[in-house]
C-alpha cells in the first residue's frame, strides 16, 4: 500500500494545506500530491496507477466543501532513466491536469524551493495517511506534523539497503513518534517551499531512529521546469 500516514501529528488547520491533492481510484485513497501551479501536480512515481483521479481543495473526506475540484491526469511524466525494478529510484512524477484550477479559499499552489534544506531544518509533513502505527486508523481530515531534516547517515544506518543518494532527503524525529506513514506517499515535505516528496520509510511508522525517505525536489528542478516548458524528453539527475 503506497499510502503513508502522519503518525504523531494533529489535524491540519483548514488553511495550511491548500496545495494538498488527494489521488484516489474507485476503491481507495491512493496517495497525496502537491499543486505547484494551476495546471501541474507533483507526486511520487510509485503512486502511479491506471485509473486515478485527483481532488483538490479537500479538507474532510466525508464532508464535501464548495471549493473542491476533481481533475483527471491529462499527461503523466516520470524520469525516463528510472530503474524499473527499484520502486524508490527517482521517485517523482509530474501530472498535468486535464484542465487548470483557479485559486480559492481552499486551493493554491505551493512554491518550489529556491535552495535545498539544511540538516536540522524543521519541516512540515501532511496527509490523509494512517494516524496509528499499529492500527488501520485513517483520518477524515489531513494530519500535520513537524519533523527535522536529518543527516543521510541516520537513514543509511536504519536502512542498509538504501543507496543514500544526494537526490533524497532523510527526515523524521530521532526519538520516534512523528512520521509519515501508510497513505501519505507522494505528499509534501514543506520548509521554504516544497522540499520533499514522501517516498518510503520504516514499517511500522514512527519508530525511533527509523526516519522516512523523501525525494529531494530541489535536485529535480531543471527536470520539472523542462517538462512544464514542453521539453518532454528531459532526463533526471
UniProtKB/Swiss-Prot annotation:
UniProt name for this protein: Platelet-aggregating proteinase PA-BJ
Positions bearing carbohydrate: 25, 28
EC number: 3.4.21.-
Subunit structure: Monomer.
Record CDD domains: Tryp_SPc
SS bond list: 12-144, 31-47, 79-236, 123-191, 155-170, 181-205
GO molecular function, one term: serine-type endopeptidase activity
Propeptide cleavage-removed residue intervals: 1-5
Function per UniProt: Snake venom serine protease that induces platelet aggregation through activation of protease-activated platelet receptors (PAR1/F2R and PAR4/F2RL3). On F2R, the cleavage occurs at Arg41-Ser42 (like thrombin cleavage), and Arg46-Asn47. In normal condition of hemostasis, the cleavage of the Arg41-Ser42 bond liberates a new N-terminus that functions as an agonist. However after envenomation, the cleavage of Arg46-Asn47 bond degrades this potential agonist. This may explain why the snake protease is less potent than thrombin in causing platelet aggregation and release reaction.
Residue positions of the active site: 46, 91, 185
Cellular component GO terms held in the UniProt record: extracellular region; secretory granule
EC class (word): hydrolase
Peptidase S1 domain: residues covered: 6-229
Amino acid at each position: 500500500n503506497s499510502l503513508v500516514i502522519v503518525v504523531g501529528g494533529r489535524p491540519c488547520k483548514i488553511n495550511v494545506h491548500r496545495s494538498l491533492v488527494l489521488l484516489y481510484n474507485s476503491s481507495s485513497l491512493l496517495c497525496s500530491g502537491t499543486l505547484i501551479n494551476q495546471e501541474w501536480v507533483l507526486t511520487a512515481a510509485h503512486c502511479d496507477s491506471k485509473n486515478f483521479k485527483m481532488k483538490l481543495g479537500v479538507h474532510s473526506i466525508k464532508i464535501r466543501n464548495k471549493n473542491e475540484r476533481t481533475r483527471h491526469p491529462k499527461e503523466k511524466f516520470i524520469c525516463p532513466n528510472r530503474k524499473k525494478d527499484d520502486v524508490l529510484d527517482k521517485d517523482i512524477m509530474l501530472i498535468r491536469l486535464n484542465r487548470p484550477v483557479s485559486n480559492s479559499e481552499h486551493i493554491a499552489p505551493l512554491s518550489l524551493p529556491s535552495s535545498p534544506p539544511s540538516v536540522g531544518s524543521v519541516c512540515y509533513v501532511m496527509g490523509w495517511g494512517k494516524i496509528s502505527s499499529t492500527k488501520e486508523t485513517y483520518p477524515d481530515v489531513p494530519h500535520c506534523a513537524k519533523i527535522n531534516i536529518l543527516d543521510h547517515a541516520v537513514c543509511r544506518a536504519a536502512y542498509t539497503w538504501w543507496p543514500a543518494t544526494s537526490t533524497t532527503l532523510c527526515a523524521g524525529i530521532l526519538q520516534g513518534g512523528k512520521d509519515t506513514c501508510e497513505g501519505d506517499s507522494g505528499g509534501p515535505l514543506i520548509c521554504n517551499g516544497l522540499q520533499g516528496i514522501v517516498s518510503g520509510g520504516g514499517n511500522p511508522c514512527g519508530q525511533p531512529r527509523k526516519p522516512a525517505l523523501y525525494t529531494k525536489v530541489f535536485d529535480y528542478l531543471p527536470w520539472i521546469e523542462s517538462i512544464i516548458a514542453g521539453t518532454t524528453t528531459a532526463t533526471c539527475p
